[in-house]
Regions:
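An N-terminal domain-start capping segment
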Residues: 1, 89-97, 177
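Short catalytic-loop micro-motif centered on adjacent basic/acidic residues
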Residues: 1-2, 62, 87, 119
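N-terminal glycine-rich anion-binding loop in soluble enzyme alpha/beta folds
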Residues: 2-70
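Mixed-charge interfacial surface used for oligomerization/domain docking
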Residues: 6-22, 27-33, 97, 101-106, ...
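Hydrophobic residues in alpha-helical segments
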Residues: 54-55, 79, 140, 173
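Glycine-rich phosphate- or other oxyanion-binding loops that anchor nucleotides, phosphorylated ligands
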Residues: 56-91, 99, 103, 150
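Short glycine-rich or small-residue beta-strand-to-loop segments that form or flank ligand, phosphate
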Residues: 84-92, 118-121, 135
């Protein structure tokens, strides 16, 4: 079982779970510094605290989608060992990572003349994706076969619902999800968007609330 770094399945967490899930790294750029998510030896908890502070400081922060060659190299050991692979990715509506994984899948399957790699569009992001990978890993441990796990994964993903709010909507504006005029009004009256993953693999507004209670 594989997932991309958008799954929030950090190495220490997977070690505690004792799950056989392999995470394909993703590139994170902060100003002029480039990190390989989960590959670089960093304190994830401390880095997360600094990361959100840097977001509030409006630093130049962005991620780069995993490219097809990254997936091919990540899969190589298991492909060479004759294993079949199920890979979960960020929702295709918010990242090109799914398409990259599909390109890698097609190249590997065509080369071997049979289905070795199957890619699941998680239709969500963050731990919603991670939860799906964990569920699939559980089924592997129970002895389910490849086809049965694939069928269950495609059903189970619609049982996972991810909802969240954002502290600042500037990133929604950058993505064109909110107009600058509406944004000014929202900031003025302190509205928070309630967001969710949609069934067509996009992020959509599900509601609006005033303030945030912690």
């Amino acid at each position: 079982i594989y997932a991309d770094a958008g799954s929030n399945l950090i190495p220490s967490f997977l070690k505690k779970l004792n799950k056989e899930i392999k995470v394909v790294s993703m590139q994170l750029t902060i100003d002029d510094t480039v990190y390989r998510c989960y590959d670089d030896d960093i304190d994830v908890e401390q880095f997360s605290k600094n990361f959100y502070q840097m977001m509030r400081e409006d630093r130049n922060i962005y991620t780069s989608q995993v490219n097809p060659d990254d997936f091919i190299q990540a899969f190589k050991e298991d492909v060479d060992a004759g294993h079949q692979i199920i890979c979960f990715t960020l929702a295709k509506g918010i990242s090109g990572t799914y398409n990259s994984a599909c390109i890698a899948r097609d190249m590997i399957n065509e080369e071997h003349g049979k289905e070795i790699v199957y890619v699941v569009d998680a239709a969500t992001a963050g731990f919603g994706e991670g939860l799906q990978a964990i569920h699939a890993a559980d089924l592997v441990e129970k002895g389910w076969d490849f086809k049965a796990i694939v069928e269950e994964a495609e059903t189970f993903k619609f049982k996972v619902r991810s909802e969240f709010t954002v502290g600042d909507i500037k990133y929604l504006i950058k993505k064109g999800r909110v107009s600058s005029l509406v944004a000014k009004f929202i900031n003025l009256i302190k509205i928070k968007f309630l967001l969710k993953g949609s069934l067509d693999s996009k992020i959509e507004v599900s509601g609006k609330v005033f303030g945030r209670k912690i």
